[in-house]
């Protein structure tokens, strides 16, 4: 390798180094500028909470363009045996009522979460929540599930297997065995088993 080759090699290296230093300097300045802009945006969003809704709408639009597919609604058509022992459907809720109730609860949760960040539901969601709440309040009060009364109701024949079945009935038995009179569990052996 001659002297001139070594000189041109060193010159090329110097130029590359200068360019590298220059570009890194530009990068540092750009990053500093970006941090300043982000700070300014955050300050604007903090001072004007309504901007959060705009950001949400922009994100939503971006997701619609090429985001993941939306969640499919849960399907409610599970097969049910129609045995004679099933409780009548009059006590239960219709599928539409269940869907409405679930949607109302979801909207209420969303409202709470947004309120934590100083944001609000969109006008359509707010209107839908009001409508669902009104429908829920106007609906006739019912309770899902079995009839009240427990395993051994006070009145009527005991439910379950003959001879006690689930547990001996302890209704009407005072807590202390020493103050107790009347029926209940035989602890002294003077009565028969209830």
UniProtKB/Swiss-Prot annotation:
Start and end residues of each stretch annotated as RNAPII-binding: 129-194
Residue numbers of Omega-N-methylated arginine PTMs: 13
Cellular location(s): Virion; Host nucleus
Positions of modified residues (N6-acetyllysine): 71
Keyword tags: Acetylation, Host nucleus, Host-virus interaction, Methylation, Phosphoprotein, RNA-binding, Viral penetration into host nucleus, Virion, Virus entry into host cell
Domain HDAg per the UniProt entry, residue ranges: 20-194
Modifications after synthesis and translation: Phosphorylated at serines and threonines by host MAPK1/3, PKR, and CK2.
Region (RNA-binding): 96-106, 135-145
Start and end residues of each stretch annotated as Disordered: 45-194
A biological process from GO: viral penetration into host nucleus
Major localization listed first in the record, in broad terms: virion
Record-level Gene Ontology MF annotations: RNA binding
Entry-annotated residues carrying Phosphoserine: 2, 122, 176
Keyword Transmembrane listed: no
A Pfam cross-reference name: HDV_ag
GO CC terms: host cell; host cell nucleus; virion component
Positions of the UniProt region annotated as Dimerization: 12-59
Modified residues (Phosphothreonine): 181
InterPro entries according to UniProt: Delta_antigen_N, HDAG_dom, HDV_ag
Motif segment (Nuclear localization signal): 65-74
Protein family membership: Belongs to the hepatitis delta antigen family.
Note: This strain belongs to the genotype III found only among cases in South America and which causes a more severe form of infection than genotypes I and II.
Record's function text: Promotes both transcription and replication of genomic RNA. Following virus entry into host cell, provides nuclear import of HDV RNPs thanks to its nuclear localization signal. May interact with host RNA polymerase II thereby changing its template requirement from DNA to RNA. RNA pol II complex would then acts as an RNA-directed RNA polymerase, and transcribe and replicate HDV genome.
Subunit comment: Homodimer. Homooctamer. Interacts with host RNA polymerase II complex, and with host NPM1.
Name of protein: Small delta antigen
Organism per entry: Hepatitis delta virus genotype III (isolate VnzD8349) (HDV)
Classification lineage: Viruses, Ribozyviria, Kolmioviridae, Deltavirus, Hepatitis delta virus
């Amino acid at each position: 390798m001659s002297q001139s080759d070594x000189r041109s090699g060193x010159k090329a290296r110097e130029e590359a180094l200068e360019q590298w230093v220059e570009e890194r300097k530009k990068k540092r300045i750009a990053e500093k500028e970006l941090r300043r802009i982000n700070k300014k945006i955050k300050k604007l969003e903090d001072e004007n909470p309504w901007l959060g809704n705009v950001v949400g709408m922009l994100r939503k639009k971006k997701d619609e363009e090429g985001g993941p597919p939306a969640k499919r609604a849960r399907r409610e058509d599970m097969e049910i045996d129609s045995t004679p022992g099933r409780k009548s459907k009059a006590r239960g809720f219709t599928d539409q009522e269940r869907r409405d109730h679930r949607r109302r609860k979801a909207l209420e949760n969303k409202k709470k979460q947004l309120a934590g960040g100083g944001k609000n539901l969109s006008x359509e969601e707010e209107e839908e929540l009001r409508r669902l709440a009104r429908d829920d309040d106007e609906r006739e009060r019912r309770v899902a599930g079995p009839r009240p009364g427990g395993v051994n109701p006070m009145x009527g024949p005991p439910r379950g297997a003959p001879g006690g079945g689930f547990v001996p009935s302890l209704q009407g038995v005072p807590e202390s065995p020493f103050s107790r009179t009347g029926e209940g569990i035989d602890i002294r052996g003077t009565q028969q088993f209830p």
